[in-house]
């Protein structure tokens, strides 16, 4: 899928340059996990494919936010994004503590 919009500047840096090993404001483990997740997002054709990795706890945030998905990066922080399966696009990609 194509990532069309990114809200968090740290994640945007990783989207633009996936070979980065460090980003200001993220520790090495967070950086590595986010890069892995971004790679999976790019190659997926359906967000249900992300559920193949149980530690990411991939799930849609419905009924409150239909179409918005969440992946667990750390105990409190999630990579969240909207998916348009027909257009094969991911938008409003963010790194947030929504709890």
What residues fall within each predicted segment?
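Enriched for short, Lys/Arg-rich terminal
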Residues: 59-62, 68-99
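Generic, well-ordered alpha-helical segments
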Residues: 3, 26-33, 53, 65, ...
């Amino acid at each position: 899928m194509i990532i069309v919009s990114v809200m968090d500047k740290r994640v945007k840096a990783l989207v633009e340059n996936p070979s980065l090993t460090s980003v200001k404001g993220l520790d090495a483990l967070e950086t590595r996990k986010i890069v892995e997740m971004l790679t999976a997002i790019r190659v997926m054709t359906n967000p249900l494919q992300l559920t193949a990795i149980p530690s990411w706890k991939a799930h849609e945030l419905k009924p409150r936010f239909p179409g918005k998905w969440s992946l667990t990066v750390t105990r409190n922080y999630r990579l969240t994004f909207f998916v348009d399966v027909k257009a094969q696009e991911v938008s409003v990609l963010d790194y947030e503590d929504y709890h």
